[in-house]
Structure formats: C-alpha cells, structure tokens
Amino acid sequence: AIAANVGGTITMIGTPPNVIVTGALATAGLPTFGFFEFAYIGIPLSVIILVWMLTIGRRMLPAHNAGEMDEEAVQAAKEEAGASDDKAPKSKTKMWISGLIMVGVVVCMALELPTVPLQTAAVTGAILCVITGCLKEKEAYAGIDWVTIFLFAGMLSVATAMEKTGAGKLIADTVVGMMGANPSPYLLTAVLFLISNVLTQFMSNTASAALLAPIGISIAQEVGCDPKPVLMALGIAASMAFATPMATPPNTLVLGPGNFTFNDYVKVGVPLCLISWVACVIIIPIFWPFH
C-alpha cells in the first residue's frame, strides 16, 4: 500500500492529485508540469521511503497473523481503484496489444508533441483498446473515474469564480497575513503541505488537491513566487496518504488481509508523512525555484 501511494507520484497519471494540480495551472494560464516532471520529486521520495522501510520503518510494521478476506470490502476497494476482474480469462495477444498501446500513449505524453496533446493521446489509447477488443465498451465505461472527472471539472469553475470574485485573493491575504510580513515561500510551502497532507488522511486525495490547488495559486501570486513549487507540494502531500485506512484504496485493500488496526496505520504512517514533508520542502525548491 505504501509503495502504491509513493510510486504514483512519479508520473502525471500515477495519482489523481498530479492531474488536478496540472489542470489548475493550465486553467490559470500558467506553465504546466510535464508528464515525467513529477519524477524529479517522485523518484527521490520513493528511494527515501524505501530506505526508511528497509531499516527503521520495518520495526514499526505490525506482526499480525493474516486476517480473513472480506470479499465485499476487497471488491469495493478494487472497484474504487479501477482494478479489473481477476477471474476473467486472459488473452496473451490482447495483453501484447494493450501493452503496445500503453507504450505508445506514454511515449506521446513524454515527448509532449504539439500536435498530440496529453488528452488526445489518452483518449486515442482508450479508443484503440476498445477497437482492438482489449476492452469491451461496458468495461471501458466502468473504468472511467467519474469522481475525478467531475471534481476536476468543478475545480475549473471554482478556480475561475475565485479569481473573478476576489475570493482567492481574500483567502491568500488571510493566510499570508497570519504568517507576518513578507513570509518566506519555504514557510508557506511547508504549511500548505501540512494542510494538504492532514486533509488527505480523512478525505479523498483528489478532493483535497482540488480544494487547495486554486488557493495555492492565489497564495503564491500574493507573495510573488512561482506557483509551480507550491502546487507540486500540494499535489505530493495529497498523495502521501499513509496514516489512516480510509485515506486511499490501497490502504483499504490491505486492511482485512493484513488484519491491521487503525493504530497500525497511524504508527507506520505518521513518520512517513513527516519524512515526506521534510524531503519535499528541501527537494522541491531545487527543481522548481520560487523565483
């Protein structure tokens, strides 16, 4: 579960918050993140957490006997995570075709071709999967994460409304004012990371990113710094959902089989959240300077 959460931060499509913060920048008319740009923070973060879990962190892991599989809970978590039916027969030909389609889509996204935008590459790949028979139409429809789509669409409207009405500036002025005159961008980034990270433990990481992304842009513009490092911190913080079983589908999926308790997640997750917080505050400004 920990590896799934951290590994998703390496690419734009690895986790919904990455897409959300990229869309927020595009809506504001600002330069956006590239497909693999998230790897600059995602890979170091993955290595740091891997080393921690292999050394000190493993001592914190619970040593429970395996629990009984709650099939309903597992199936619900799989559906939320977009997993396919394990009992369906597998076709090697379709596996190769779908693999080639995925490689083609990723290459197009990585090259950032002006004639093939990210959304065009993604939709084309999905259509090819249906045309080639790798997916049935109903399976493709069921695989769409409607929550993310509607949250993303709603976020665009909210961001525009906050800009037009001045609500974004009001919130930014309030937050900045609480930190004194001329607050450091490092301090702002650290505080916003904590807010996003705490929220994502108790609500969808997609929702927390959608809620804070427009506010993060307003705050960055208020203090005169580049919004990209602030948005990157918000997005990564929303994906560092380790401390509760309901934070992300991977956490929920292993709850029953691992026979874990709520306190197990807190014991293992809180140190990981603090480590990721310190690492991001140090690493993010290196690749995305504030000025």
Model-derived features: positions:
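Hydrophobic transmembrane alpha-helices of multi-pass small-molecule transporters
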Residues: 37-173, 189, 272-273, 277, ...
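Short helix-coil transition sites and intra-membrane helix breaks within transmembrane domains
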Residues: 7-17, 114-118, 161-168, 198-211, ...
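Hydrophobic alpha-helical transmembrane segments of multi-pass small-molecule transporters/permeases
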Residues: 1-8, 106, 153-160, 193-202, ...
